[in-house]
UniProtKB/Swiss-Prot annotation:
This is Glutamate 5-kinase. Gene3D superfamilies: Acetylglutamate kinase-like (3.40.1160.10), PUA domain (2.30.130.10). It is found in: Cytoplasm. Belongs to the glutamate 5-kinase family. Residues 280-358 form the PUA domain. It comes from the Bacteria.
């Protein structure tokens, strides 16, 4: 099963606050430098990488001279705003030493639940990854409400894994993985090396909360693994203090807890699309487009669409039908109904001429398309 780790080409790596700070006294630049060395080595091995970094609140607390994590929301948000500056600067300078560019992206869960913003974020992240840039993602703590209290960077990392269709989510923590009992209280506790993410037995052993600087306990990590599994990603929960942990995972070493999905990525994602979105409009296709979708599993291009029906926005679900009215597929449209009306029947190269811009060359990308 560890071949799923060694063969993974797109990783989302989440690093917790405890692994990025010097015992609560600000960011540990040396530790961050070691993480960067490991991630650069993955890059050089051909791995596409997205980093989800905690640490903004902890860094801000240090700059403000606070020794205890505040409970008041406005104080947490102030600390996050101050700390985010130093956090991003530290990552940028460390990666620059190795000739790598980084990009800061701040997200909230609303950004990923709104379909239009979801597609925008997806396109941006894909472009950055293809350019060899390492996106550094954090939750936008200054504008969220309850999320900041519950260590939701674990959940955010899982949602990002879904967003970029990652093969692997690596959650680095201050524990070696999931155990069958609390190792802090039970010296006989055994590490769970491999399990199915949806195994109900895991709930009984995932109790406990996070440390003083972060709030992400093992329960949030299990929930994150289950979220990632919906799009087919495998998750490794592993100790961040293990020497060369990322390289050793890449090499197939049996470290941490590997939680696997029930389905492969494509099937799980298609099922998620099919079961959670209402249709907002209809695209009537020509015979060539029907064949391209049904037989060749290609994206839907504007040139293959004859008619647009209904009112929909970018990112909403539409039905694709054959000339005789048979439903062929459903998918997330890259363009609104008004935009689609202007570009149907035209080649992708003509989109800019018709609209003045081009969001995507496809009307519906095959990754966002479900055959019925």
């Amino acid at each position: 099963m560890r071949s799923k780790v060694t063969g993974a080409q797109r990783w989302v790596v989440k690093i917790g606050s405890a692994l990025l700070t010097a015992d609560g006294k600000g960011l540990d630049r040396n530790a961050m430098g070691v993480w960067v060395e490991q991630m650069v080595a993955l890059h050089e091995a051909g791995v596409e990488l997205v980093l989800v970094s905690s640490g903004a609140v902890a860094a801000g607390m240090s700059r403000l001279g606070w020794t205890a994590r505040p409970s008041a929301m406005h104080e947490l948000q102030a600390a996050a705003a101050i700390g985010q500056m130093g956090l991003v600067q530290a990552w940028e300078s460390s990666f620059a030493e190795h000739g790598r560019h980084t990009a800061q992206i701040l997200l909230t869960h609303d950004d990923l639940s709104d379909r239009k913003r979801y597609l925008n974020a997806r396109s941006t992240l894909r472009t950055l990854v293809e350019l060899g840039v390492v996106p550094v993602i954090n939750e936008n703590d200054t504008v969220v409400t309850d999320e900041i209290r519950f260590g939701d960077n674990d959940t955010l990392a899982a949602l990002v894994a879904n967003l970029v269709e990652a093969d692997l989510l690596v959650i680095l923590t201050d524990r070696d993985g999931m155990f069958d009992a609390d190792p802090r209280n039970n010296p006989d506790a055994q590490l769970i090396y491999e399990a199915r993410a949806d195994d109900p037995a895991l709930d009984a052993v995932a109790g406990g909360t996070g440390g003083a600087l972060g709030r992400g306990g093992m329960q949030t990590k299990l929930r994150a693994a289950r979220l990632a599994a919906r799009s087919g990603a495998h998750t490794v929960i592993v100790g961040g203090r293990i020497e060369r942990v990322l390289a050793r995972l890449k090499g197939g070493e049996r470290l941490g807890t590997l939680l696997s999905p029930e389905r492969e990525m494509l099937a799980a994602r298609k099922q998620w699309l099919a079961g959670h979105l209402q249709t907002r409009g209809t695209l009537v296709l020509d015979d060539g487009a029907v064949s391209a979708l049904a037989s060749d599993h290609k994206s839907l291009l504007p040139v293959g669409v004859k008619l647009v029906q209904g009112s929909f926005r970018r990112g909403e679900m539409v039905v694709c039908v054959a000339p005789d009215g048979r439903e062929i597929a459903r998918g997330l449209s890259n363009y609104s109904a008004i935009e689609a009306q202007k570009i149907i029947g035209h080649s992708s190269e003509a989109i800019v001429r018709e609209l003045g811009y081009m969001a995507e060359p496809e009307l519906i990308h095959r990754d966002n398309l479900i055959l019925v």
